[in-house]
Amino acid sequence: PTPGPALIWPVQGELLTGFSKDALVYSETMGQWQAHEGVDIAAALGQVVAAPAAGTVTECLEDMLMGYTVVIRHDSGYESRLSNLASLNAVSVGDRVQQGDTVGSVGQSALSEEKLAPHLHYELMLNGAQIDPARVIKG
């Protein structure tokens, strides 16, 4: 794909769990081997989560496994799914956000990852398929 405008990491922190769409990784919380179609980035509870790029908020939902989640469709064609948030109070569906705007804060709402240290679960999609954010975002 043609690279769109640069994306930034929504939080700064150590990578706890990397992207693994094809190779299974063991989930301590779920007690099973499974794909991990995003990345888990260590962050303090309450740490601000930023929009990786400009776009429109398309979903604000409470996912049964991934917790409070905000989805942004970026102008570049990418889509970001930011999960394990503290609440859904920062943005609403239809809001336009610019790169770096606050879209939430880190929480512990993801039941499927509750045994991990506080973190943001971040999925990046292009044309409906999950891709490794580390292959697109530099730094």
What spans do the regions from the language model cover?
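Soluble periplasmic/extracytoplasmic beta-strand elements of cell-envelope proteins
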Residues: 8, 12-18, 36-40, 69-73, ...
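Residue-level recognition of beta-strand microenvironments
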Residues: 18, 60-61, 85-88, 106-109
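Hydrophobic residues in beta-strands and at strand termini
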Residues: 43, 51, 74, 124-125
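Short alpha-helix capping/helix-loop boundary micro-motifs
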Residues: 43, 88-91
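Short acidic/polar mixed-charge low-complexity motifs
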Residues: 47, 76-78, 129
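Zn2+-dependent peptidoglycan hydrolase active-site motif and core
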Residues: 51-87
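Conserved, short, structured surface segments that act as functional micro-motifs
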Residues: 95-139
